[in-house]
Amino acid sequence: LFFSDETIKKFSKTSEEVFRPVQKNTAKSKVKLNVLYEDENVIFLNKPVGMLSQKANREDTSLVEYLIEYLLDSGQVTREELKTFHPAVCNRLDRNTSGIVAGGKTLSALQILNEMFRTRSLEKYYLCLVSGKIKDGQRICGYLKKNTKTNKVSVTKEKRETKEALPIETEYTPLFVSDHVTLLKVHLITGKTHQIRAHLAAIGHPIIGDYKYGDFKINEAYKKKYGLKTQLLHAYQLCFPDVELVKNLPNRQIIAPVPDLFKKICIDKGVNNNGCMEFKRSSGFDL
């Protein structure tokens, strides 16, 4: 998901509602950000499972607050400067989805990045481990409708008589296939709420560990064996076009290593033996 212009404008306002510093001497203040790339304009972070991309409630502490503290501690911004502009993130991942979150240190960079996400001028790729065998890659289309009461979405192949149904497109390529699971590289073409999770579940291949859209019995088996409590879905790659909109970003690829538990489960399933270069690349080192 990307943020609207109204959201971007919010970060330039002076308000305690916008930024409340992370309280020092607490467990939360000990979080160390995993910085994938940064320069004077932008920063790309590898968000861990369990962390909010942005606040859901006023009392929450999200990646945005940790980002501000990081910039303050490293001397890249002052509290006086925060009175006129707040650096922020411009895309959002589900709380229990790990991976790349892009941030802007300047208003101009934040606006440009947000526009690139909105217009899909950059490519977003995910890794996920799904139930069942998928032998061939495919580009699938459908319509997604969100139930705000349950915070859950449903996907159908055909558009039904409702204005709320939004068109979605998801493209996937199998990187490794076993008897019971498939490691997929997913190109997120549109970027709707829970799109990858719901779309894959709709075609009979839910993501392992996804209790909202997945198979409860399978998830419980992985929980018992590995302690897995969240979906094995990771935003691992951003590919920028050859356009000089933001300095240093043309043709740049940002890659985020997968979490240790994700990596362990994949290795146990034989991904390493299969010689999956895409997974080795995303893992951060040769397995």
Task: List each model region and its residues.
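RNA pseudouridine synthases
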Residues: 1-152, 161-169, 177, 258-268, ...
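Short, solvent-exposed loop/turn segments that connect beta-strands within catalytic domains
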Residues: 9, 244-250
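Pseudouridine synthase
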Residues: 60-67, 176-240, 262, 285
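Residues that recognize and position ribonucleotide moieties
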Residues: 91, 138, 142, 165, ...
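Acidic/polar residues at beta-strand termini and the immediately following turn/coil
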Residues: 147, 242-244
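Short, solvent-exposed loop/beta-turn-alpha elements that line the ligand-binding surface or hinge
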Residues: 155
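Long C-terminal interaction/binding lobes of large macromolecular proteins
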Residues: 172
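A glycine-biased structural micro-motif
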Residues: 249-252, 256, 268
